[in-house]
């Protein structure tokens, strides 16, 4: 079985850019998890409100909610 070894020096290095240098601090917390529930309750509330919003839009689209004074074709 033929195998080929590649030295580390021959691997292409990622090019450093100005944007990458500016965004690097934003990724410094990668892999760290806050103890406890964190912001999970806020996300649950946001998801519930978004679901209500979508259901209202769907009901308006299906004309199952009567809108007084708004003419539709």
From Swiss-Prot:
Regions that span the bilayer: 41-61
Superkingdom, taxonomy of origin: Eukaryota
Record has ATP-binding as a keyword: no
Assigned GO CC terms: chloroplast thylakoid membrane; photosystem II
Location(s) in or outside the cell: Plastid, Chloroplast thylakoid membrane
Record keyword Transmembrane present: yes
Gene3D superfamilies: Photosystem II reaction center protein H
Protein's membrane topology: Single-pass membrane protein
Region (Disordered): 1-23
One example of a Gene Ontology biological process annotation: protein stabilization
One Gene Ontology MF term: phosphate ion binding
UniProt keyword annotations, A-Z: Chloroplast, Membrane, Phosphoprotein, Photosynthesis, Photosystem II, Plastid, Thylakoid, Transmembrane, Transmembrane helix
Description of post-translational modifications: Phosphorylation is a light-dependent reaction catalyzed by a membrane-bound kinase; phosphorylation occurs on Thr residue(s) in the N-terminus of the protein.
InterPro entries reported in the protein's UniProt record: PSII_PsbH (IPR001056), PSII_PsbH_sf (IPR036863)
Modified residues (Phosphothreonine): 3, 5
Protein family: Belongs to the PsbH family.
PANTHER family, A to Z: PHOTOSYSTEM II REACTION CENTER PROTEIN H (PTHR34469:SF4)
Oligomer and partners: PSII is composed of 1 copy each of membrane proteins PsbA, PsbB, PsbC, PsbD, PsbE, PsbF, PsbH, PsbI, PsbJ, PsbK, PsbL, PsbM, PsbT, PsbX, PsbY, PsbZ, Psb30/Ycf12, at least 3 peripheral proteins of the oxygen-evolving complex and a large number of cofactors. It forms dimeric complexes.
Function of the molecule: One of the components of the core complex of photosystem II (PSII), required for its stability and/or assembly. PSII is a light-driven water:plastoquinone oxidoreductase that uses light energy to abstract electrons from H(2)O, generating O(2) and a proton gradient subsequently used for ATP formation. It consists of a core antenna complex that captures photons, and an electron transfer chain that converts photonic excitation into a charge separation.
Family annotation (HAMAP family): PSII_PsbH (MF_00752)
Name of this chain's protein: Photosystem II reaction center protein H
Native species: Triticum aestivum (Wheat)
Name of the gene encoding the protein in the UniProt record: psbH
């Amino acid at each position: 079985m033929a195998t080929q070894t590649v030295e580390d020096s021959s691997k292409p290095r990622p090019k450093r850019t100005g944007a990458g240098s500016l965004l690097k601090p934003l990724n410094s917390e990668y892999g760290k998890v806050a103890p406890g529930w964190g912001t999970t309750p806020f996300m649950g509330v946001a998801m519930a409100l978004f679901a209500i919003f979508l259901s209202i839009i769907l009901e308006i689209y299906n004309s199952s909610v009567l809108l007084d004074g708004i003419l539709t074709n």
